[in-house]
Amino acid sequence: MRQILLSVLLAISTFSNAQELFSLTEPASNMPVGSVSFRVDNSIMDEINSSKVNYHLIPNIRVGASKKLMISFGAFLSNRSANQLKHEGGSIYAKYRFLSNDAIQRHFRMAAFATVSHNNSDIHQEEINMYGHNTGYEAGIVATQLLQKVALSSTLSIAKAFDNGGNNKFVYGLKNSKAINYSLSFGKLILPKEYSSYRQTNINLMVETLCQVNTGSGKHFLDIAPVVQFIFNSQSRIDVGYRKQVSSSLLRTAPKGFFIRAEYNFFDVF
């Protein structure tokens, strides 16, 4: 009975602040220690100057390794280089929370994160993206502020691209292989108005802005992404959003489209 109660409390503590569980960026908060989640990300993006749709499927296994550390393992699949879904690579992501200033219905947290990615697909755009496109690394910090039903989060990171596998060279030159990424995300809990059970469905609305500046060329892009999120039984979630380019001087092959995330969490696994 005690283990069941602990699992329920973990679920409530994780998803009662679901308005900070953003879709395109990670908050500074971590998964509960001992938890494991299975996540599937789907991107359905319109290719420029074409009727083709770029579909990327990225399944992830995420582990709450400790109170401060979480680790994620992802695989990259897409239809871009073939007419069927093809495995193209994978990544390892880690996040370490180094600051927590918590109070009732509010907190401020900061974390450092890093990603190492390997990809075998052709390099087809100037944008540097470690989540399904480039081989390389990304490292940065994230700060998240929760104030009752509203969450604000911001990230700052640097990304470095290398040649992709399969003899797919980074064709834009060594000088243009680094970029600075930054983002600002806003989330608000819409329903329920009052909590009476951890089984209540949560509905959150979010808006995320994402920007990249290439340190060599100075070229940039700015995107905006509205998202609606559903949390079920404090254990699973579905996010549906639309990402749209606001401005860009970088070559990008698919700058707008829909994304869908499905995730299920297991608490107190180890």
Language model regions located:
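Transmembrane beta-barrel domains of Gram-negative outer membranes and organellar outer membranes
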Residues: A18-S154, I158-D163, G173-F270
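Extended low-complexity, intrinsically disordered segments associated with secretion/export
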Residues: N168-F170
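Sec-dependent N-terminal signal peptides
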Residues: I4-S13
